[in-house]
Amino acid sequence: MENIERELKIVELYKQGITQKQICKECKCSTNTISDVIDKYNIPRRAKRKKNKDLSKFKDYSLPETQYWIGYICADGNIQYDKNNRVYKVSLFSKEEEPINKFVKYFGEDTVSVHRRPTGIIEAYINSKELCEYFIQVYNIVPNKSNILNPSVGFTTNFILGYFDGDGCIRNSSEKQIRYECNITCGSKIFLEKIMNILDKQGIYSILYQHTDCLAYKIRIDRKADSEKFYKWLYKDAVVCLSRKLNNFVALYGNIENSKLGELQEFEGESAAKLKE
């Protein structure tokens, strides 16, 4: 194997999360060579593996905040289960600091690692075969889930809020036009139909349609009265949320009765500072 080809392969395997032992075996190199190559190509070093991981919160779906984060992972997360390369990882992705900080704070710094990609995406992840298997076997949240997402969990308000914070949006208003439209996007029609049925039972009118430029589907709530109902229903029992989206709703409809919401609107600056260290 030419040196340049081997270096590029080392870089690719390292970025995929393949263990150094496996990289050494496949590329016939030493760990020192791996270190030299990733430094040469300015690849950020991976966080050291966590030895004292506590997975109990992930497995206790009765906890409202766990419901929220399972929903968020369904939207903007990934399960990597690769027996051949021994890579087992549950990840959550965001361009924003806030959800990453809150995720780490809830599940613990001894459990969650954080990786900043050159693209600006931040990944919070847990390396654990046990956790991956729990997600797959118990929650039915599988690798490459986008178009087949159909988790076997309760679709609580906190779960739906977590999904909405990951893959939902509120149309931006302007000085000339106030918009009330809310959207929830997913590649799985079955998943969105379940949410739509729940909204219907709450008297919230919504429309389900397929994007014309891709395979994804979208729930749209565009009437002012229904958008306001959706907001009040979605956040009534919230224990954690993305403050940016909450503030957009508050700007349209004002505050609702939930003693936690004032705290939820505050960005956790101390956690952000710690994450940047």
What do the PLM-derived regions correspond to, one by one?
Residues M1-E277:
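Internal intein/HINT superfamily modules and their associated LAGLIDADG
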